[in-house]
């Protein structure tokens, strides 16, 4: 792990800082934007042959020309030019890359409590001095003005356990009498607050370690502490009651959470305890527990662990170390949900390789080399590793399944917290065929969370995050299949608090790689830049709608907006303008054709049949269609629009697109034009326009490609029928159509898993099929009112 002082990380707490954070941009109010986009007299026609460079240029000006008054007061100077906007993004990306690539053992804030226990270790050479004097110095330098020690976020449990421990450490070496006095006064004046403390925010092992600290304080003769206070006596009683329920020999048999608080357990058989020591020398990654073990055993592995933790944490000790697994997994999760992971693909690959290397058959814990695993880190690991193509066995979750069918964060859990079960739910949604443990996990997690929400009993003891409950509610309403990337990001901006999140362990702590304001600042700037470009593309789409007389085919502008939204919410990157435009146009033109062929008009049935056949079998000869057909207004408009759609590309791409449309026409003629063929056409079009096919048309006949095409066709045809009939049935967070669910799982498996034998098709090609399928599922799952809200959030709502 790099020094905690690197990258401007302060040592108390170790949280990332930037002298000039990226500006938060604000777009004009929605009413202005909406009116501007929908009133043709508000702007000059752009012409439907607009190109990517033109859009990008106008977008840069849009982002950069914001008034200074629109920029938050605390985020530095206003961004006024395209160069400044791009520079802000580039600086933030560079900063985050450096942060991630120097993560090492993971960054975590120093814990006063653990630092105090380590400070008690006497010099190994027998001198009357601490072995780790830097810990004593850290304590002396980090007392708060009110006499307490702890996180700036006030919680009486955190302040009491930290302050008691710091007072004991200072008194043990008879230094800083003034600080001891202030600390004692704080405890005496505030201990009564424990009676009304928020039980959900009680620090881990509080009732186990407090009596042990108090006994040490008594032995040191510290005067003035409220030893006889009723609340203190109650804590002693609670500890006795809890420990009486645990068989004495259990602690020696296998790793349990008791190893995290050895300093609070009293007499132990240390020979047996040492057999449960982790490979890095720690006891469940706890510096305080390991320090106590060293004081009892003088074990050299314990010492090496403590020495390493103190050296890498600015002279203090965190509440847990290392946090390499925890930091990496949650950092990836945050970057993905904020919509900025594309900037950090090499770093994410590096992180996931590390997680894969330390993975065990029972999962993982917050730090590597731990015999103990928990469902939180394991669930997050399963989801992210599977999502990125790693071959991971979800049966690790069986380790957390109890005899009654319930899942628990770890054995012996007294109160089940919400966030680990929510992460279990997230992992369980990424299910491949035959993964029964994930089916069981889905049902349990969904019902557990729904019941807790319904009864207003959501309890969270691992993190203090203001909007966690809202995040969970949304996650249950919007499962992974029905979530589009930019919709997820738009909502996550509301929930992600950056450095405002506080984590709960033995003490409160901060995680810069997880909770980082620069992440959000970069995400907001990027979202606004993308949104501005999407708005200009929407202007262009409206011009195309008018010039192509799309309305005459019974297609409303709102339907056009939905088609464009699905594209923009899925492939949102600024450089993918061409793909977004083709996505929306392909959906609309295919509907125009079906509308023309199905509605009564001036053409006879025989003429329409002739036109239909010529479309399907002689696309290259569109100009040769007889004059009778061209003379019909709608037929002429349709032919012109269709021809323009194909001719916007080079000859070879146009040739490939014509082939894709020919296949679609054949299926339409065979009566398969009810969604499935549309999805297949869309996936083929996107892969062609993105250059994935290029001069290698053999890909189109590859076994994986044809299987994906077939699955996408079949699933999306069924989803279209469901959408039309509005009969999507959901139970326990899963659709009741088991056949379709199994097909969806097969598609996801084929897309995400890397081919074991090699020779598979490019991952980006496969991802296109998943993206298209998810938009069909999205439309079948969500009501129109919900979709309207999402359209507003993604395309028009300013993000600040």
UniProtKB/Swiss-Prot annotation:
Organism: Isodon japonicus (Scutellaria japonica)
Cofactor(s) needed by this chain: Mg(2+)
Annotated GO MF terms: copalyl diphosphate synthase activity; magnesium ion binding; terpene synthase activity
Motif (DXDD motif): 374-377
Keyword Chloroplast appears in the UniProt entry: yes
Listed name of the protein: Copalyl diphosphate synthase 2, chloroplastic
Recorded domain comment: The Asp-Xaa-Asp-Asp (DXDD) motif is important for the catalytic activity, presumably through binding to Mg(2+).
Domain of life: Eukaryota
Metabolic or biological pathway, per its Swiss-Prot or TrEMBL entry: Secondary metabolite biosynthesis; terpenoid biosynthesis
Subcellular location: Plastid, Chloroplast
Recorded catalytic activity of this chain's protein: (2E,6E,10E)-geranylgeranyl diphosphate = (+)-copalyl diphosphate
Keyword hit for Transcription regulation: no
Annotated residues for binding of substrate: 242, 461
């Amino acid at each position: 792990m790099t020094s905690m002082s690197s990258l401007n990380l302060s040592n108390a707490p170790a949280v990332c800082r930037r002298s000039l954070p990226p500006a938060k941009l604000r777009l004009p109010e929605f009413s202005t934007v909406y009116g501007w986009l929908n009133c043709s007299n508000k702007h000059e026609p752009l012409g439907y042959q607009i190109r990517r460079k033109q859009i990008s240029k106008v977008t840069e000006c849009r982002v950069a020309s914001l008034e200074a008054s629109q920029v938050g007061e605390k985020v530095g100077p206003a961004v006024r030019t395209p160069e400044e906007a791009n520079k802000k993004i580039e600086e933030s990306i560079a900063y985050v890359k450096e942060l991630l690539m120097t993560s090492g053992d993971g960054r975590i804030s120093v814990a006063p409590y653990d630092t105090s226990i380590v400070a008690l270790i006497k010099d190994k050479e027998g001198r009357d001095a601490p072995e780790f004097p830097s810990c004593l110095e850290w304590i002396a330098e980090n007392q708060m003005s009110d006499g307490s020690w702890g996180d700036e976020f006030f919680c009486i449990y955190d302040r009491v356990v930290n302050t008691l421990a710091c007072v004991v450490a200072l008194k043990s070496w008879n230094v800083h009498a003034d600080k001891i006095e202030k600390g004692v006064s704080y405890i005496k004046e505030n201990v009564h607050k424990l009676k009304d403390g928020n039980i959900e925010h009680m620090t881990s092992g509080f009732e186990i370690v407090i009596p042990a600290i108090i006994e040490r304080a008594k032995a040191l003769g510290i005067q003035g502490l409220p030893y006889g206070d009723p609340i203190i006596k109650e804590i002693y009683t609670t500890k006795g009651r809890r420990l009486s329920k645990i068989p004495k020999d259990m602690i020696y048999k296998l790793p349990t959470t008791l190893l995290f608080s050895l300093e609070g357990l009293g007499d132990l058989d240390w020979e047996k305890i040492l057999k449960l020591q982790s490979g890095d020398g720690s006891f469940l990654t706890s510096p305080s527990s390991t320090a106590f073990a060293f004081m009892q055993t003088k074990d050299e592995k314990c010492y090496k662990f403590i020495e390493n933790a103190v050296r890498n944490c600015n002279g203090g000790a965190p509440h847990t170390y290392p946090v390499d697994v925890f930091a990496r997994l949650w950092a990836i999760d945050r970057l993905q949900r904020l919509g900025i992971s594309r900037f950090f693909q090499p770093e994410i690959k590096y992180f996931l390789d590390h997680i894969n290397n330390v993975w065990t058959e029972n999962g993982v814990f917050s730090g590597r080399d731990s015999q103990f695993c928990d469902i939180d880190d394991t669930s997050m690991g399963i989801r992210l590793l599977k999502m990125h193509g790693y071959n991971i066995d979800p049966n690790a979750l069986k380790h957390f399944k109890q005899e009654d069918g319930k899942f628990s964060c770890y054995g012996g859990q007294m109160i089940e917290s919400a966030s680990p079960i929510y992460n279990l739910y997230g992992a369980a949604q990424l299910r491949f065929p035959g993964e029964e443990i994930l089916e069981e996990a889905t049902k349990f997690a969904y019902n557990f969370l729904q019941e807790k929400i319904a009864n207003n009993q959501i309890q969270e003891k691992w993190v203090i995050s203001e909007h966690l409950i809202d995040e969970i509610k949304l996650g249950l309403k919007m499962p992974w299949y029905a979530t589009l990337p930019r919709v997820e990001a738009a909502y996550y901006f509301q929930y992600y608090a950056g450095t405002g999140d506080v984590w709960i362990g033995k003490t409160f702590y901060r995680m810069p790689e997880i909770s980082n304001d620069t992440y959000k600042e970069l995400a907001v700037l990027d979202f606004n830049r993308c949104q501005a470009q999407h708005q200009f593309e929407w202007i262009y789409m409206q011009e195309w709608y008018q010039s192509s007389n799309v309305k005459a085919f019974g297609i409303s502008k709102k339907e056009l907006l939905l088609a464009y939204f699905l594209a923009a919410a899925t492939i949102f990157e600024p450089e993918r303008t061409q793909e977004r435009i083709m996505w929306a146009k392909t959906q609309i033109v295919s509907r125009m054709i079906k509308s023309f062929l199905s509605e009564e008009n001036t053409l006879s049935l025989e003429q329409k049949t002739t036109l239909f056949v010529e479309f399907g079998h002689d696309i290259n000869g569109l100009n040769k269609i007889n004059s009778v057909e061209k003379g019909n207004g709608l037929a002429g408009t349709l032919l012109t629009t269709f021809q323009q759609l194909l001719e916007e590309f080079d000859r070879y791409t146009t040739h490939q697109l014509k082939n894709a449309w020919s296949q679609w026409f054949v299926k339409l003629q065979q009566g398969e034009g009810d969604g499935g063929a549309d999805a297949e056409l869309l996936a083929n079009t996107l892969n062609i326009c993105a250059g994935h096919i290029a001069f290698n048309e053999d890909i189109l006949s590859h076994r994986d490609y044809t299987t994906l095409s077939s699955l996408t066709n079949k699933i999306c045809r069924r989803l279209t029928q469901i959408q039309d009939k509005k009969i999507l049935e959901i139970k326990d967070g899963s659709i009741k159509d088991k056949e379709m669910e199994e097909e969806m799982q097969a598609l996801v498996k084929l897309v995400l898993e890397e081919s074991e034998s090699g020779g598979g098709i490019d991952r980006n090609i496969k991802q296109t099929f998943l993206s298209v399928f998810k938009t069909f599922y999205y439309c079948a799952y969500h009501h129109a009112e919900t979709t309207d809200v999402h359209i507003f959030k993604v395309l028009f709502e300013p993000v600040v």
